[in-house]
């Protein structure tokens, strides 16, 4: 399979500006039909997508934008949540199986799940932890972001000094 994965560093005071550039009519014809969105643009990418997948909408962050071939609309997805939570669960399951334990539910259910950061990836992990029955504890430097995430996912929050 042949593919390209170009990377650009986009610095702007307007968080929408870099995403609007990526989702422009110029970008997608040059670079196929998909783009990945990184820090700190995942929350702004929600507003720049024509449609947002229900999971990404619930999380409030988009990290993958796909151009739908039939109508050219840009669809925003969040792959951080499922990929990260599943990887954590798989690692914990392997450890428990090695210790002779059997699991039928998520190994993070009923556990405390610590998050450092309240940006787009942090939002995805908080959502995933809550959906699996874990309690999120959020550590972040910016109290405003932290409070929004804490209110949305009912986690505990702790302010970090940088």
Question: Where do the model's predicted regions map?
Answer:
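Phosphate/diphosphate ligand-binding glycine-rich loop within oxidoreductases
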Residues: 1-96
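Short phosphate-engaging motifs
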Residues: 41-44, 121, 145
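Short, acidic/turn-prone active-site loops that include or flank metal/cofactor-
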Residues: 58-63, 142-144, 162
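Glycine-rich adenosine-cofactor-binding loop
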Residues: 76-81, 88, 92, 96-133, ...
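NAD(P)-binding Rossmann-fold cofactor-contacting core
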Residues: 131-154
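Short acidic low-complexity segments
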Residues: 153-162
């Amino acid at each position: 399979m042949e593919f390209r994965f170009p990377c650009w560093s986009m610095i702007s005071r307007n968080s929408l500006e870099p995403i609007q550039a990526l989702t422009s009519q110029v970008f997608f014809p040059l670079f196929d039909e998909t783009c990945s969105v990184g820090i700190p643009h995942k929350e702004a990418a929600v507003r720049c997508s024509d449609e947002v997948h229900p999971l990404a909408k619930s999380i409030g962050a988009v990290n993958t934008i796909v151009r739908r071939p039939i109508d050219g609309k840009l669809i925003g997805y969040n792959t951080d949540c499922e990929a990260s939570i599943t990887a954590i669960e798989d690692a914990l399951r392997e450890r428990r199986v090695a210790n002779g334990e059997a699991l039928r539910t998520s190994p993070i259910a009923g556990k405390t799940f610590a998050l450092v950061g309240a940006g787009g990836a942090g939002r995805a992990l908080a959502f995933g932890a809550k959906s699996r029955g874990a309690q999120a504890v959020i550590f972040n430097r910016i109290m405003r972001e932290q409070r929004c995430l804490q209110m949305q996912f009912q986690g505990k929050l702790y302010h970090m000094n940088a």
